[in-house]
Amino acid sequence: MKKLILTALFATGVVAGIEAAPTDSVTQADLQAIIQRLNKLEAENKAQAKKIAELEGKNKELVAKQSATEKKVETVAVAKSEDSGKIATDKDTEVSESGRIYTAKGRKYYLADATAKIFEPLSESGLRITPYGYLVFEGVYSTRPLDCDWSADFVKPRKGKTNNTTLSMQDSILGVQFDTPEAVGGWTFTGRAEFDLAGGDQNSYDFHWRHLYVNAEHESGWSILFGQTWHLWKMVTPSEIDGAWMENAGHPYRRSPQLRVTKKWDWEDSSLEARVGIVKGGPGMGGDRDDDGVQDNSASTWALVEGALVYDRDAPWQDKNDGLQDGRWLLGIGGQYGNDRSHRYTETGFDGQEDEYKSMMGMIAASVPIWHFTLKGQFYAGQNLGGVQAGCGQRVSYNTFGGRGNEVRTIGGFIDLGYKLNDTWSFAAGWGCDDPIDSDVEGSLAGVDGILYNDRFYIDAFYQITSNFKLGLEYARLMTSYAEASGRAGGDYDADRVQFSAYYDF
């Protein structure tokens, strides 16, 4: 349109000039020059129009990229209702009274973050990076010496009472979760890098890797994970505050390098997850009982083969609109089977021939919500489980010099009852035990600590001050039973333990 107007105006001016000029002065050469000038102007107009079109195209691309970036950041439109004063959000999000938003994928952030668009930043490659973690201050008092000052598995076999106190920050966790916002051929990729500050005592804040893995998940329900994370059979967790987390008292667990394949079937109100994988080496995987510098699980050509089958379903008796009620129940089975290798014990130490030892376990676990309560627990049985915090930390017992060792068999489990009173107060109580077979432990020359039984009872109270700051208080009663051995009297040793914790979650 602009070209037509300019051409018309110019032509009108030319015609007017021609009409005003004397007729005898207009020659064929003049007409030819005018035509050439018009053609030149038309070409210039076409070039200008092409340039304008290119600029408009680039502008559209910039607008599209900006829109895509805004979608990746997952901004949430928030408005306050004039009538009810409630916060309105996009579909599939929930907002607590504190202003924290819970998305459909379970992520959480604040309205201020959504407005400023500063949460979950995207890297240049399109990777979404989410820092997380918590800082925790812990104060502990115990009536007897325990095996560790800031967390505890066992009561030490000492006569008399010696009170102990300690302060620490070692249970603090720092981590980064990363994922690709968009699927590639139906696959999405997530990962995690997480560490804590667990060290030898309350002043030793050594970095300790907890999780370090990548998980590729397909829209069909298949996923492949490689890296270090929980063993495949881990399904439920006690509510205990102590950083020992009921290890060697009914709650086996470990995080170790692995390759796992998972298939999940999702239905309208339930799901079924099948896990299978191999676990090799890593922290605590059999340890190094012969002290040859190689972990016993790594010394064997066999890896641990692990698996689990977990079914969970909506609990129809629960009120889904009550934010204080857990709405799903869970039932699962799992286990492991594999070998480790170590030298036999002789009169001069672990320098005898090498042997392979079986490590195996079967487990059943469940979690059931009942109104504001949640009842959960597990039971397991197996042998040579010291590497996964069971069998009271005992793996293989050597009863004769130069003879083959015996795998320590054990059974155990825990039960935990949690209660959520309101958004501020919650409580829990639980008990667990680990009970090795006495004959596998008694009379041992090496390889075990002579622990015949270990249990723990605890009561917890939590007070949520803000959405990311809470306090916790725990009383625990610990009891460890020892076999009689050279330089140590057998018997039961108990202790009372009180822990105060302050958590800052981010």
Feature roles, as predicted:
Residues A20-C148:
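N-terminal periplasmic/intermembrane-space "pro-region" immediately following the signal or transit peptide
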Residues T188-G199, F226, V276-K280, G332-N339, ...:
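Transmembrane beta-strand segments that form the barrel wall of outer-membrane beta-barrel proteins
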Residues P145-W150, A198, Q202-W209, V236-A244, ...:
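Outer-membrane beta-barrel translocator domains and adjoining extracellular loop/strand segments
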